[in-house]
């Protein structure tokens, strides 16, 4: 998968109806394309990414997690530091939708039922799928195939979360 959704800023809102065993929330961050078109910088968010998240907290140390992220990916060779890419002049813009399921592991106990403030670093991994349009470059143009495909990946996310109040959790990934 040639996309990178990075520097995610998550705002997770615990659900009151489930005694904080389940969490629902949203997040916003940045995205950028990593590939053979555009910038050669690995972390260089240039478009907005946003999505939703659901978690089932099985214990103070782990949770099952599902998320959906939407973003527009774009790349422009003229903005690259590579003179060959600048000379070539390719560019593209496309909308992508990513879905992910997996396991989140807390390095410290993160008990949502505790009355005291909690904080912990965490690790998330699982499987993700991105739906994207298919296209190819000719020597002068970007040509759409008018079809879409799925790409699969294994996300590895390191984050930190803390309780802001009894029902609000703030997390950074």
Language-model regions: role of each:
Residues 22, 61-64, 111, 166-170:
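Repeated loop/turn-to-beta-strand initiation elements of outer-membrane beta-barrel proteins
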Residues 1-24:
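Bacterial Sec-dependent N-terminal signal peptides
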Residues 62-138:
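Gram-negative (and chloroplast) outer-membrane scaffold detector with strong preference
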Residues 20, 44-48, 95-99, 119, ...:
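Residues that define the transmembrane beta-barrel architecture of outer-membrane proteins
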Residues 118-173:
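Outer-membrane beta-barrel transmembrane domain signature
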Residues 34-40, 84-92, 141-146:
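Extracellular loop and loop/strand-boundary signature of outer-membrane beta-barrel proteins
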Residues 26, 52-56, 101-105, 125-129, ...:
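Residues on the lipid-exposed face of transmembrane beta-strands in outer-membrane beta-barrel proteins
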Residues 18-57, 134:
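Short glycine/proline- and aromatic-enriched beta-strand/turn motifs that initiate or cap beta-hairpins
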């Amino acid at each position: 998968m040639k996309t990178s959704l990075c520097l995610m800023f998550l705002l997770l809102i615990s659900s009151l109806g489930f005694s904080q065993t389940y969490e629902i929330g949203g997040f916003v961050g940045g995205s950028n394309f990593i590939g053979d078109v555009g910038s050669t910088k690995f972390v260089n968010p240039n478009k907005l990414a946003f999505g939703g998240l659901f978690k089932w907290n099985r214990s103070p140390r782990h949770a099952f997690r599902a998320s959906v992220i939407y973003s527009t990916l774009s790349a422009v060779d003229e903005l690259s530091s590579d003179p060959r890419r600048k000379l070539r002049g390719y560019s593209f813009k496309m909308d992508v939708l990513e879905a992910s399921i997996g396991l989140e592991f807390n390095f410290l106990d993160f008990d949502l039922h505790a009355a005291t403030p909690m904080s912990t670093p965490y690790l998330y991994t699982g499987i993700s799928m991105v739906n994207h349009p298919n296209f190819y470059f000719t020597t002068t143009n970007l040509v759409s195939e008018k079809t879409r495909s799925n790409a699969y990946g294994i996300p590895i996310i390191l984050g930190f979360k803390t309780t802001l109040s009894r029902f609000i959790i703030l997390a950074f990934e």
